[in-house]
């Protein structure tokens, strides 16, 4: 019985890495999605509407990044987002862009599209380099 338990634990150790984490296929799919988002976002509104999807891709990519890459993008994202609080506590969703649900003036649109372009180029750079 003891050897069967040991064998079972060993098998789980071998199989568990295959079932968890951010796989190469996930990374490739996100890379293609970032390229597609950047290519298809031609006007300001589509860029602004795509910001949250870029942030979601970054969240999935986050564990596989080096500490320097994380810090660089985190500083950039934190500078342009607000933390969402529910009863004074951060919500499960985390952070939202400062300009996502506001009536956008031309100046705010410029900031939002600049954020989209910079975040998109940073994410694309992670996938290519």
From Swiss-Prot:
Subcellular location: Secreted
Keyword match Membrane: no
InterPro entries referenced in this protein's UniProt entry, alphabetically: Turandot
Keywords: Immunity, Innate immunity, Secreted, Signal
Tagged with keyword Secreted: yes
Signal sequence extent: 1-21
GO terms, biological process: cellular response to heat; innate immune response; response to bacterium; response to heat; response to UV
GO CC annotations, alphabetized: extracellular space
Alphabetized Pfam families for the sequence: Turandot
Entry similarity comment: Belongs to the Turandot family.
Function: A humoral factor that may play a role in stress tolerance.
Protein name: Protein Turandot B1
Lineage: Eukaryota, Metazoa, Ecdysozoa, Arthropoda, Hexapoda
Gene that specifies this protein: TotB1
